[in-house]
Design a protein with these regions (language model features):
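Charged, terminal alpha-helix-loop-beta segments
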Residues: 1-144
Length: 144
């Protein structure tokens, strides 16, 4: 078991190593849609690439989610398979968001032997989600 400082150092090293291996600018928060973002997540059990829709207005949040959900067939056939769509996802802080994600199980940020596998997963899945978004962003952004 690592101390808190060791865990923080290891996570920092993980992200620096990822940035060195895949040194490119990701869209992440630069979607031009308020509270709509792409994210990476990793812990000691899994790695995930996510789309989080966190709009404070539930109606708008659901509209954005439903836009992507309407494209689910195209998204899964042409870009990323095995996506999970969660219209009402509850964060630990009690906030309700909409989340779409793909995950790789049985990997760990604390074990360097998994890092390349996680990095490749992150790159492949995020790149595919970004390509989908860039192709369909006008449709996704067009809500009432």
């Amino acid at each position: 078991m690592y101390s808190r400082e060791e865990t923080q150092r290891l996570k920092r090293e993980f992200w620096v190593s990822f940035a060195e291996k895949y040194s490119r600018k990701w869209i992440l928060y630069d979607t031009k849609i308020k509270d709509f973002s792409f994210k990476f997540f990793v812990d000691n059990r899994k790695a995930q690439v996510l789309i989080d829709i966190e709009h404070r207005n539930d109606e708008k949040r659901l509209q954005y989610f439903e836009k992507i959900e309407a494209l689910k067939g195209i998204l899964e056939e042409e870009f990323v398979k095995d996506l999970v769509f969660e219209k009402e996802f509850y964060l630990e802080n009690g906030k309700t968001i909409s989340r779409i994600w793909v995950e790789k199980l049985d990997v760990s940020v604390s074990n360097r032997k998994y890092w390349d596998e996680i990095f490749d997963f992150f790159n492949e899945k995020m790149h595919a989600l970004e390509m989908f978004y860039l192709e369909y962003d006008a449709f996704i952004k067009d809500i009432e």
